């Protein structure tokens, strides 16, 4: 999957993955992580997610990583924020208050870029990637993150019925990819009744899983 795919999605405003409000799982389970206010939270492949505004509103410092400059611009504009912009290595950094969005290729991240990130929030990153890229993604996070904790949300369905993204990620793949982490499933829910696109494709079961992870 090339970068051009996502640039085109944003250019065409084909962003069905964007949610119009903060994610309920985030609001329900994040407080249980026990991360101190002021902790830095990494949000990979963040888009213009309102979850980042929610985290900042709870007193956390957010570092989102996003390929699309359009998404980054939209986030700050829609939040009514003026951003300072500078170049840092392979990334263009946009910053306002407690939120930094790093515009560039996630796979260019280095350990020093996330050395202060003791929180992780992934609602739509892992499931946005095809299998080989998921393996790279999980491997990189496992390699570069310091000690910390976070939340991961996945989808699990019969992949052959529908081409991703979002892609199906089985429980076994999560546990294998993050083998060095403590991975605890805290909720699993069949949401097929809320998902017309999947119903039309003949999908019978669409399971959203929420994991608490410690790394």
Curated annotation (Swiss-Prot):
GO molecular function per UniProt: thiopurine S-methyltransferase activity
InterPro entries hit by this protein: SAM-dependent_MTases_sf (IPR029063), Thiopur_S-MeTfrase_Se/Te_detox (IPR022474), Thiopurine_S-MeTrfase (IPR025835), TPMT (IPR008854)
HAMAP family linked: Thiopur_methtran
Matches recorded under SUPFAM superfamilies: S-adenosyl-L-methionine-dependent methyltransferases
Catalytic activity annotation: S-adenosyl-L-methionine + a thiopurine = S-adenosyl-L-homocysteine + a thiopurine S-methylether
Matches recorded under PANTHER family: THIOPURINE S-METHYLTRANSFERASE
Protein name, per record: Thiopurine S-methyltransferase
Binding site for S-adenosyl-L-methionine: 10, 45, 66, 123
Major place of residence: cytoplasm
PROSITE patterns: SAM_MT_TPMT (PS51585)
Gene that encodes the chain: tpm
Uppermost EC category: transferase
Protein location: Cytoplasm
């Amino acid at each position: 999957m090339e970068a051009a795919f996502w640039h085109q999605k944003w250019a065409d405003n084909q962003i069905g993955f964007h949610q119009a409000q903060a994610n309920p799982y985030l609001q329900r389970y994040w407080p249980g992580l026990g991360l101190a206010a002021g902790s830095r939270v990494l949000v990979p492949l963040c888009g213009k997610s309102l979850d980042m505004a929610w985290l900042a509103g709870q007193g956390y410092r957010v570092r989102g990583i996003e390929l699309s400059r359009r998404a980054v611009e939209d986030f700050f504009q829609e939040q009514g924020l003026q951003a300072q912009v500078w170049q840092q290595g392979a990334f263009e950094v946009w910053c306002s208050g407690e939120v930094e969005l790093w515009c560039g290729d996630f796979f260019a991240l280095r350990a020093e870029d996330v050395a202060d990130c003791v929180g992780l929030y992934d609602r739509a990153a892992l499931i946005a990637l095809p299998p080989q890229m998921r393996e790279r993604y999980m491997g990189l996070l496992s390699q570069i993150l310091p000690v910390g904790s976070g939340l991961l949300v996945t989808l699990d369905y019969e992949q052959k019925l529908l081409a991703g993204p979002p892609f199906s990620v089985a429980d076994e793949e999560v546990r294998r990819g993050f083998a060095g982490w403590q991975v605890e499933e805290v909720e699993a829910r069949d949401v097929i009744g809320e998902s017309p696109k999947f119903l039309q494709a003949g999908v019978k079961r669409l399971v959203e899983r929420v994991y608490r992870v410690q790394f």
